[in-house]
Design a protein with these regions (language model features):
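Short "domain-exit" segments at the C-terminal end of structured domains
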Residues: 203-207
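N-terminal amphipathic/basic leader segments beginning at the initiator methionine
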Residues: 2-45
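Mg2+-dependent prenyl diphosphate-binding active-site environment of isoprenoid biosynthetic enzymes
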Residues: 34-35, 39, 45, 49-202
């Protein structure tokens, strides 16, 4: 468990205030939450196991494919600014990774993607049906975990965010091919990607 903020720890290691702004690198901050990220990785893999072998296979295929885990890392870093990183922030970070992974499985079907994270996309191996349903499972798993945290505000934030992400997917589907409407394009980016990233620094992780 972290007792001091990794962000503040890195700031204290550099020189003047001007140097602090120039010298802090993401990898230096992430290094300070290495033990927590290792524990998170164990949670992510262990808790996804089910009695349905195909679900296990598809979920492990994408979760073990080398993702950067940037979104859950942001959850932990944001939480560390206000309190030590205990189990609640770790579980929220886990939820965020499940949600993100679910969107990747769905997105690859919508886009007809052949690869994901330098390997064959799940849909290329097990088909669209298994890929979509595995994404649905991860989504359901994430919201089940949210209910165990007994934090209504957090549940509302996550519910609203996933609604916006679905709107973004549909907006992209309905967008005219070859359209150069910049406003619509930026709206799609916000709904599909940015809104999930923004909640990492705003979501309440305390019960």
């Amino acid at each position: 468990m972290i007792t001091n903020s990794p962000v503040r720890n890195v700031q204290n290691e550099v020189g003047s205030p001007e140097q602090k702004n120039l010298q802090i690198r993401p990898e230096e901050i992430l290094r300070n939450i290495g033990p927590e990220m290792d524990l998170l990785e164990k949670f992510i893999i262990h808790d996804i196991d089910t009695d349905v072998e195909l679900l296990n296979t598809v979920a492990h295929h994408i979760l073990l494919a080398g993702g950067k885990r940037l979104r859950p890392a942001l959850v932990l870093l944001a939480s560390s600014l206000f309190e030590s990183i205990g189990e609640s922030p770790l579980r929220v970070a886990q939820v965020v990774e499940y949600l993100h992974t679910a969107t990747l499985l769905h997105d690859d079907v919508v886009d007809g993607a052949e690869t994901r994270r330098a390997q064959k996309a799940a849909r290329q191996i097990w088909g669209n049906e298994a890929s979509v349903l595995s994404g649905d499972y991860l989504l359901s798993k994430a919201f089940h975990m949210l209910t165990t945290l007994r934090n209504l505000e957090l549940l509302q934030i996550m519910s609203r965010t996933t609604t916006l992400m679905a709107e973004g997917e549909i907006l992209q589907l309905s967008r005219q091919i070859g359209s150069e409407d910049e406003e619509v394009y930026l709206r799609i980016i916000y709904l599909k990607t940015a809104c999930l990233s923004l909640i990492h620094i705003s979501e309440p992780t305390r019960p």
